[in-house]
A protein has these predicted regions:
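Loop-to-helix element that buttresses phosphate recognition and phosphoryl-transfer chemistry
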Residues: 7-68, 118-132
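GST-like fold's C-terminal all-alpha helical module
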Residues: 127-153, 159
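Alpha-helix capping/helix-boundary segments
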Residues: 60, 155-156
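Short glycine/proline- and acidic residue-enriched helix-loop micro-motifs
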Residues: 105-126, 215-221
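Acidic, low-complexity terminal tails and accessory targeting/binding regions
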Residues: 2-4, 87-97, 140, 145, ...
Length: 221
């Protein structure tokens, strides 16, 4: 059976999310609020018939996936290609600190947002290549109509840019445990929900702007 619906999920909240510190590949665990978010999402998703959940192997993602698995019978499949962008020397910093302490490097990134490779880290193009490969493998290997992909903000946005021409990552927020859903439409895909957080029922969620944003978006607070 071909995959007809894919549900993308962002991990639950960590303390670094609250502090607006960029995590990259750092093994930051969920905080208590992030666990509550994940449990709320698990209750929401337990009846949707998901057969497999492909997940980033970063700690915050795996912890979110493990909570979801308590409420479902799907197969849990870690994949390092679904990790967030590795931001090298900038990991653990706020956006303001990056701009202040690495002003030249940050300016260079703004001039070449797709191919600039952060010192010790990745470019957006690096992330796009591995995300496209992971996505292709999901479609080739998955069994069942509905599968999930638990990944991170930048990783998901670069994939969306590839799948949906005209997609603007700076115009889209993705909150913690948000759900973004797409359905197959002939030979292509159609977005049917973006940043859906209705399952949180009053629980706080937060989003981060893109590294390339020229200033903070107040919606990200």
């Amino acid at each position: 059976m071909a995959v007809e619906r894919i549900i993308f999920i962002r991990p639950g909240e960590t303390d670094w999310n609250k502090l607006e510190r960029w995590q990259g590949w750092v093994a930051v665990p969920l905080n208590e609020h992030g666990r509550q978010q994940s449990e709320a999402l698990a209750r929401f998703m337990r009846s949707i018939g998901m057969t497999a959940l492909y997940t980033s192997d970063l700690k915050r993602a795996l912890q979110t996936a493990e909570i979801l698995s308590r409420f479902g019978t799907f197969e849990l499949i870690p994949d390092e290609r679904l990790r967030e962008r590795n931001i090298g020397l900038w990991q653990g910093l706020t956006l303001d600190e990056m701009r202040k302490w690495y002003a030249d490097e940050y300016a260079a990134m703004l001039k070449d947002a797709d191919t600039y490779r952060i010192p010790g880290g990745e470019s957006r193009e690096d992330v796009r290549v591995r995300m496209k490969a992971a996505f292709a493998d999901v479609l080739a290997q998955a069994k069942g109509e509905t599968v999930g992909i638990l990944t991170h903000t930048t990783a998901l946005k670069v994939l969306m840019e590839d799948l949906f021409p005209g997609y603007n990552p700076l115009a889209v927020n993705l909150g913690n445990t948000s759900v973004t859903t797409m359905r197959r439409s002939g030979d292509s895909w159609k977005l049917v929900a973006v940043d859906d957080c209705l399952h949180l029922e009053g629980l706080r969620t937060s989003a981060v702007t893109e590294l390339e944003a020229k200033q903070h978006d107040p919606r990200d607070r």
